[in-house]
Swiss-Prot record:
The keyword Aminoacyl-tRNA synthetase applies. Binds 2 magnesium ions per tetramer. Belongs to the class-II aminoacyl-tRNA synthetase family. Phe-tRNA synthetase alpha subunit type 1 subfamily. InterPro entries: aa-tRNA-synth_II, aa-tRNA-synth_II/BPL/LPL, Phe-tRNA-synth_IIc_asu, Phe-tRNA_ligase_II_N, Phe_tRNA_ligase_alpha1_bac, Phenylalanyl-tRNA_Synthase, tRNA-bd_arm. NCBIfam families: pheS. It is an enzyme of class 6 (ligase). This is Phenylalanine--tRNA ligase alpha subunit.
Length: 339
């Protein structure tokens, strides 16, 4: 046993003196490898030169020594890892009070969705629209009830809407239409002309859809507002042609259905491939949205139109991007392309 104690003591001393991982692994192989010294001692137990009692006693002692060696090895390995980490932290130390530094190559461009948002707001601002904002976590009233969306409407299904865990009374807003409701409640009296951009959330994710995306919705409420080319059609047609910088761009309004507008329409533009492409939805504000239980605007006196567009989709069209997910990957090589 004295020989065993001597070997393990030498091994532990060698482990503690190791200066790097390479030396440490060599020491482990010398003592615990297939031909290591402690491994060799275990093999002597089966040479037939010991009685069963001696083999049991000496074997237990050798295993105890192996465990001591392994404990010392683990401690040294952890110490070397810690020393390596501290050295790296010291080398990469950053004073967070220092001013920020520009990205390599002077990259200062805004995100393409932000650039698209700014362009949309700029165009509508030029037509007299005010920017409005609201919370992203909405209650059932503002997100559904006030917009004439009944309790059994498919949009309320959990597979389409993210519910907040508070008894299913709040949701991550599924559109920016609640901003319009809040604005009308605060404004009280028309005329109202707003554009409401922001993040919205729906349970969807693929090359052309994201669970979080960006919308911009417009609202115009005043006496005598109509769907005709003097009002809704005129505003959106002018906007879409100026956005894509094409005075000859063909625009069509295709009958559709939305709970909060009547009549309603999908808006299409003619693509470069000669096919119609959907870019938004619109319609005349449903009289139920104006009623006393909602925003208390007299539907006999006032009319209004609303429209909505997907900013991410507009960015894809503007910059010829075919996969929506590229906007959320934070790849600088991709983002540097946009000015």
């Amino acid at each position: 046993m004295e020989n065993v104690n001597r070997i393990v003591a030498e091994g532990i001393a060698a482990v503690e003196a190791a200066q790097d991982f390479n030396a440490l692994e060599q020491i482990k192989a010398r003592y615990l490898g297939k031909t290591g010294e402690l491994t060799g001692l275990l093999k002597t137990l089966f040479t037939g030169q010991m009685s069963p009692e001696e083999r049991k006693t000496i074997g237990a002692h050798i295993n105890e020594c192996k465990n001591r060696f392994q404990t010392a090895f683990n401690a040294k390995r952890d110490a070397l890892n810690e020393a390596k980490l501290q050295a790296r932290l010291a080398a990469e130390a950053l004073d967070i009070t220092l001013p920020g530094r520009a990205q390599e190559g002077g990259f200062t461009s805004l995100h393409p969705v932000t650039l698209t948002l700014q362009r949309v707001v700029e165009l509508f601002h030029g037509m007299g629209f005010e920017v409005a904002d609201g919370p992203e976590i909405e209650d059932d009233f503002h997100n559904f009830q006030a917009l004439n969306i009944p309790a059994n409407h498919p949009a309320r299904a959990m597979q389409d809407t993210f519910y907040v865990e508070n008894g299913f009374t709040d949701v991550l807003r599924t559109h920016t239409s609640p901003i319009q409701i809040r604005y009308m409640l605060d404004k009280k009296e028309p005329p109202i002309r707003i554009i409401a951009p922001g993040r919205v959330y729906r349970v969807d994710s693929d090359a052309t859809h994201s669970p979080m995306f960006h919308q911009a919705e417009g609202l115009w409420v005043e006496e005598g507002v109509t769907f005709a080319f003097t009002d809704l059609k005129a505003v959106f047609t002018d906007f879409i042609r100026r956005f894509f910088e094409r005075d000859d761009l063909q625009v069509r309004f295709r009958p559709s259905f939305f709970p909060f507008t009547e009549p309603s329409a999908e808006i299409d533009i003619m693509g470069e491939n000669g096919k119609w492409l959907e870019v938004g939805g619109c319609g005349m504000v449903h009289p139920n949205v104006f009623t006393l239980k909602n925003v208390n605007i007299d539907p006999e006196k006032y009319t209004g139109f609303a429209f909505g567009i997907g900013l991410d989709r507009f960015a894809m069209l503007r910059y010829n991007v075919n996969d929506l997910r590229l906007f959320f990957d934070n790849d600088l090589n991709f983002l540097k392309q946009f000015e």
